[in-house]
Amino acid sequence: MQAAVASKTNISLKGSTEIVTEFFSYSINTILFQRGLYPPESFTRVAKYGLPILVTNDQSLKDYLDNVLKQLSEWLLSGDVQKLVLVITDIVTKEVLERWVFDVTTDIPKEGEAPRQKPEKEIMNEIQAIIRQITASVTFLPLLPNACTFDLLVYTSKDLAVPQKWEESDPKFITNSQQVKLRSFTTTIHKVESMVAYKISND
């Protein structure tokens, strides 16, 4: 009788960083598309995590995201990222309407420690579940006004120097908000827990 064996993948700090950075890239694109912050025609469909995912083909947005993710990747590698937050704001009223929060816990392997192991398929399935939840969020999130913008906030270790072109920010919390916890995933080195907070209408 044959036994099916789930192949384990050795997880390095560099490999884990690449997985998490890529997840953030696809998550941000999915949120921007699902919440209608950019025209649907400015997105291209790709296959990732066993799902169809829409990614931007707007060059200025791609450049912005590439710059943020490059810096984020460096901070993930050094264990300095605490959370990534995507904030959606009403352009007219400047009111914060949504906060997509990705909390990051890092457990960097110690020198001489045996390689961490986890099946790659298991990690991909965990990520797939989060992307599915982001896509399904339109069923419960309030409609956004026509003119909205977004910011990306990265919470880091306090003693970390802020690079040029980056600036300190307030947390951009939402007054009168509802929170929905989403799923999490772990590479065994980085754990990402996600949630969305949205403004409750006063109507």
Curated annotation (Swiss-Prot):
PROSITE patterns: HORMA. Belongs to the MAD2 family. It is found in: Nucleus; Chromosome, Centromere, Kinetochore; Cytoplasm. Its main location: nucleus. Component of the spindle-assembly checkpoint that prevents the onset of anaphase until all chromosomes are properly aligned at the metaphase plate. Required for the execution of the mitotic checkpoint which monitors the process of kinetochore-spindle attachment and inhibits the activity of the anaphase promoting complex until all chromosomes are aligned at the metaphase plate. It comes from Dictyostelium discoideum. Interacts with cdc20. The protein has two highly different native conformations, an inactive open conformation that cannot bind cdc20 and that predominates in cytosolic monomers, and an active closed conformation. It comes from the Eukaryota. Keywords: Cell cycle, Cell division, Centromere, Chromosome, Cytoplasm, Kinetochore, Mitosis, Nucleus. One of its GO terms (biological process) is mitotic spindle assembly checkpoint signaling. The gene is mad2l1-1. This is Mitotic spindle assembly checkpoint protein MAD2A. The keyword Nucleus applies. InterPro entries: HORMA_dom, HORMA_dom_sf, Mad2-like. Residues 14-196 form the HORMA domain. Residues 194-203 are annotated as: Required for assuming the closed conformation and for interaction with cdc20. Coiled coil: none annotated.
